Amino acid sequence: MGPGRAAEVIREGLYRGADNGYLLTDRAFAGADTLATSYALATAIRKIGDYDIIIGGRQAIDGDTAQVGPQIAEKLHLPQVSYVAEIAVENKAVTVKRLLEDGYMTIKVQTPCLLTCVKELNDARYMSVGGIMECYNKPLEIYNYETLKDDPPHRRGYHRPERLSHECVQVLLSPGEGRRYDDGGRRQGDRRE
């Protein structure tokens, strides 16, 4: 998820052996907090479907919160392990080595699952010229707000809460919904004897 220029980063993943690449880009996603980001990504993952393991980074460089991966797992009802430094896949199970402050923890989890990984996980593959040329035939799908939207009420999931404050005030003060009070704290029209 990012601006159009993020396609180059996804292409690099294709150069290094990924089968498909997906980019979520739209001005509607700009400035999204972790909840909005995880909602958009989970919606895209549901739309793409057919996955065993969703692998993400430990944290974003802009927010540095490490919340998006676990929030996606929650929205997709998947088991998740964070700070993964090693992965071994066997049938429908994944054994991971999770980085801790004072060592490692080995965890076995069933697929489908979501893993957020530390940079020590592996060394990037060498990109051959042939591989770079071949990747241009691999699909890079672009998703935007229109291709991802599922229900109009969920539109709010893509925006920061503070952007919705004006909309909330309008709903609260809409005709028939608002109440007026006098200086004594009594609702106008009420009679107190």
List where the protein language model places each region.
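N-terminal glycine-rich FAD/FM-binding segment characteristic of electron-transfer flavoproteins
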Residues: M1-E193
